[in-house]
């Protein structure tokens, strides 16, 4: 078995056969400020709406976002929602959709009305028929799955109890997969775990697990004991119980239970977090990870998913940044180009309660004075962002002969330092716009300045932050080094 970083290169070579209930997720965002005069009901002033591939389709999207290939088998109706889903899946380069159309039922569609300000779900409207698929449609699904099975490295059944995963279909797929020595992961909905007998791994949430095992599932000891009984019933290798803010517990048939606490994040939306967990587990196990590595990766994936709005997918880069400590990331992963997206980093760090620090400069030729400022800056915060003047900006500030090194080279040198968590290139002459975007808790500046002279001090102070001044080291400056080099005295 392989550790997390060793698994990553193999992910792109894996194919996951995902089968389950496909649905169209729509999120309508707005604000409620009044009650309808027609009835005692809130009126939502709609600001925007989003449409996403949901249910088992979101599992497929997560698999593809992680870089693996996904063959997806699902069911749609002969309607606009079905056509929207079919087109959306077909547009994903790593997803091969194999969709069966059932004209007798609508495509499952869920519309959620959400407070744009508080990210609170106010109402959900569903269009669905949850009855099992007809015998004819069931056979079409089974035939499609068995035809695709040889091409898969692992099978994932995503059960939302909307009619795709009938008892017969589950049985035929698991039996066929076992004959081909392919592992099967099941995200179950039925409380009868015997239905999934022979699967490799079941991934119920705590509510589903408690219902299936008729236990309270309110302690790790009880979860472990009940899981071992359930493993015998389901004849599976392991059961993973997800527990929202309390983390996850994996109970293998052989060996001790493993519990990992949830990452401390600001929860924006829990929709689809279970999909991410199932997808990460499938991809990691297919790529050669052991239970422990797959569990910790899935836990990290869930943390990223719930920090996003709507039905979210998680990329391999996001997963890697969550699993690995910042200091271990490659330099190029710590660089944001001018105008690039800072939000994922800021959201993640703030959700974890981390103090974000900021300093800036040209950093043309790194010298001990720079190192002193960067070290002091990192010591004053939990995560340090360095604003780096672009080549055009340096030229305007320092003259036509500068910079000596281009912005990419300067950024890579800074990003290689353990003290630096993120390098952000900016085009302006001052970092004011960047500071306005970041609103750091700590603003650090080296040199002979007063607090009032530091660009952006008022923005930081207004949010209760602090400005830290660091004395410069005498005799160290890039301008002096460049002049000495030009005069042959370097």
UniProtKB/Swiss-Prot annotation:
The active site is at 275. Residues 1-330 are annotated as: Ribokinase. Pfam families: CTP_transf_like (PF01467), PfkB (PF00294). Residues 358-490 are annotated as: Cytidylyltransferase. It catalyses: D-glycero-beta-D-manno-heptose 7-phosphate + ATP = D-glycero-beta-D-manno-heptose 1,7-bisphosphate + ADP + H(+); D-glycero-beta-D-manno-heptose 1-phosphate + ATP + H(+) = ADP-D-glycero-beta-D-manno-heptose + diphosphate. Keywords: ATP-binding, Carbohydrate metabolism, Kinase, Multifunctional enzyme, Nucleotide-binding, Nucleotidyltransferase, Transferase. It is an enzyme of class 2 (transferase). GO terms for molecular function: ATP binding; heptose 7-phosphate kinase activity; heptose-1-phosphate adenylyltransferase activity; phosphotransferase activity, alcohol group as acceptor. InterPro entries: Bifunc_HldE, Carboh/pur_kinase_PfkB_CS, Cyt_trans-like, PfkB_dom, RfaE_dom_I, RfaE_dom_II, Ribokinase-like, Rossmann-like_a/b/a_fold. In the N-terminal section; belongs to the carbohydrate kinase PfkB family. Catalyzes the ADP transfer from ATP to D-glycero-beta-D-manno-heptose 1-phosphate, yielding ADP-D-glycero-beta-D-manno-heptose. This is Bifunctional protein HldE. It comes from Rhodopseudomonas palustris (strain BisB18). The gene is hldE.
